[in-house]
Amino acid sequence: MIIDTHTHAFPDALASKTIPMLAAKADVTPHTDGTAAGLSAAMQIAGVDIAVVLPVVTKPSQFASVNAFAAELNKRDGLISFGGIHPDDEDIPAHVAEIAAMGLPGIKIHPDYQGVFIDDERYIRIAREALRHGLYIVTHAGVDDGFPECVHCPPERAVRFLDQVYEGREPAEPRIIFAHGGGNRQFSEVRKHLAGRNVYFDLSFIFAYADAEKITELIRAHGAERILFASDCPWGDPAEGIRFVRSLTLSDAEKEMILGANAQRMFAKYIP
């Protein structure tokens, strides 16, 4: 089973406006139209069995609509959607509990889109509440190519975030995922500060520019059992990502873990 753990889909009317805007901002060519149907089609072509959709709440007032759409996505075959919350949310404990009650497996946060540093107390509160409810947390990490001016989740701050969330008691099974290899375009800092910590890294988008040797070194430093295949579709091509992982100088068992076994273990109760 192949699971793409980092994808995006928008309501049809919103996708037609949002995808061209973000594509122009980051100077990338999208691989789908940004709709759920477009995402499902891309996954089928690539041979992906399940796509995990990660929404972003860019202002507190979007909480209800974003999470309602996430719940609708979870009714579609082959899609598992996280929920979202903004750090300025007026009632973080209640809304995290609501996400859990909706049956969503976790929460996506995006420090660059939300304009808050990852080690801010508001994100600490969100993460602690999420973990209390058994939810996963996925955060954008490193440079955002569309908004490169300020990096809100560099590896050094990510470490401070972890230390405050876990308070020295890291769980046996990781429940926090740092996207883009732990820090987009910051692999040296990731290896120095984050590699080896009890967290997952996903591989979203980085195969589009990073060479195989650097990514293999990162995987070796962190451990294949804590690496998740991800394309960032529509910004990355899942088929290209699968080919990239299969080309790495890793064992077949390590490639199997990355492409799906790790995520299958994480999301077992959400997979029919």
Where do the language-model regions lie?
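Mobile, glycine- and charge-enriched loop segments
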Residues: M1-H31, N67-G84, R191, G196-Y200
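A cross-domain feature marking catalytic cores of carbohydrate-active enzymes
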Residues: T7-A9, P55, G83-P87, I109-P111, ...
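Catalytic pocket-lining loop regions of alpha/beta-barrel enzymes
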Residues: P105-G106, D120-L228
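Active-site gating/metal-coordination segments in enzymes
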Residues: D49-I50, P60-D145, Y209
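Mid-to-C-terminal alpha-helical segments outside catalytic/metal-binding sites
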Residues: M1-H8, L14-I50, A221-L228, A239-P272
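Conserved, mostly hydrophobic/aromatic
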Residues: H6, M43, A70, I99, ...
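Active-site environment of divalent metal-dependent phosphoester hydrolases
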Residues: F10-A13, T58-S61, D88-D91, Q114, ...
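Structural motif corresponding to alpha-helix initiation and N-cap regions
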Residues: D33-A37, A64-N67, D89-P93, D120, ...
